[in-house]
């Protein structure tokens, strides 16, 4: 779905040409009848112990919401890459805002925002690494068209370096729990309120740990690249009296505005949000 389609098209091309992933395995790409089918396939594959990802935006993301609750409740290491786009209301629009991802804030997914092309490359890795170690599924989102279709030169982290960052124990645990007809189990059954509440609250331990896990991976990416990613990056005067908070492609324009205002003697700053959920 526009404007996320190019991501899936690139993966399709890589898969067709036999490009392998970090584990030296060919990537299987499946095209479904709709976004509802796509996220259902992701759910099923993750239940079998496969690491999965998909790409979507806007109305496509809205169709996925019922299964997003399932994925987060079952603590599946899944990443959605979202080129954030307006959700159609009185009319349709293919252009960017955050109305689609904002509609998913209560799904239990962690939400990581990139402001530019280089950040997309780096923080996509952070999302995939963090979901394996942290057990919480991720939405990695960035602005549709403004960022998703921007052409920039970037510096990528070598694959052999990324592979070293994978938590092998957490990955083994996930794969070991995959459904297997040789060892049948039953999951996601109906429970009464007493057990439902207890089991739901039990997952909070992973949400409490997640910001630290994301921060640790950001620091490791910083070490490899020389860049400076934090959960929240501050830019501007140390003694700022006026501070703007934002995320996404607005960052560059706001930073230029902060520079201009500070040169005029004002004390201003900007807080860029990367990890929006859990907040």
Language-model features: where?
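Conformationally flexible catalytic loops at phosphate/diphosphate-handling active centers
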Residues: 23, 27, 138-233
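A general structural motif
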Residues: 91-94, 213-229, 246-254, 273-279
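Short, solvent-exposed amphipathic alpha-helical segments in soluble enzyme
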Residues: 11-15, 69-72, 128-130, 155-158, ...
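Redox- and metal-dependent alpha/beta enzyme cores, enriched for Fe-S-associated oxidoreductases
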Residues: 231-234, 238-267, 279
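Short helix/loop capping segments that flank catalytic or ligand/cofactor-binding pockets
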Residues: 64, 90, 149-151, 253-255
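Thiamine diphosphate
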Residues: 1-103, 108, 125, 145
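Short beta->alpha junction loops
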Residues: 29-33, 271-278
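Conserved thiamine diphosphate
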Residues: 94-144, 168-169
């Amino acid at each position: 779905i526009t404007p996320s389609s190019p991501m899936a098209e690139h993966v399709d091309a890589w898969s067709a040409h036999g490009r392998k992933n970090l584990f030296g395995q060919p990537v299987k790409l499946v095209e479904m009848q709709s976004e509802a089918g796509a996220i259902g396939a992701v759910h099923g594959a993750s239940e079998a112990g496969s690491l999965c990802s998909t790409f979507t935006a806007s109305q496509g993301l809205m169709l996925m919401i019922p299964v997003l609750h399932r994925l987060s409740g079952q603590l599946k290491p899944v990443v959605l890459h979202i080129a954030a786009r307006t959700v159609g209301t009185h009319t349709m629009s293919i252009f960017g805002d955050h109305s689609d991802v904002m509609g998913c804030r209560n799904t239990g997914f962690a939400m990581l925002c990139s402001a530019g092309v280089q950040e997309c490359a780096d923080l996509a890795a952070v999302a995939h690494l963090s979901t394996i170690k942290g057990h919480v599924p991720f939405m990695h989102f960035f602005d549709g068209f403004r960022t998703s279709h921007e052409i920039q030169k970037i510096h990528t982290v070598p694959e052999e370096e990324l592979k070293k960052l994978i938590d092998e124990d957490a990955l083994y645990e996930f794969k070991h729990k995959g459904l297997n007809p040789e060892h049948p189990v039953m999951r996601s059954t109906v429970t009464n309120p007493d057990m439902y509440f207890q089991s739901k609250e039990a997952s909070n331990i992973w949400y409490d740990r997640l910001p630290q896990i994301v921060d640790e991976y950001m620091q490791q990416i910083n070490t490899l690249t020389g860049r400076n990613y934090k959960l929240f990056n501050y830019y501007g005067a140390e003694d700022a009296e006026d501070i703007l908070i934002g995320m996404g492609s607005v960052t560059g324009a706001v930073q230029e505005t902060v520079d201009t205002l500070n040169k005029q003697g004002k004390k201003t700053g900007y807080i860029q949000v990367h990890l929006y959920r859990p907040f």
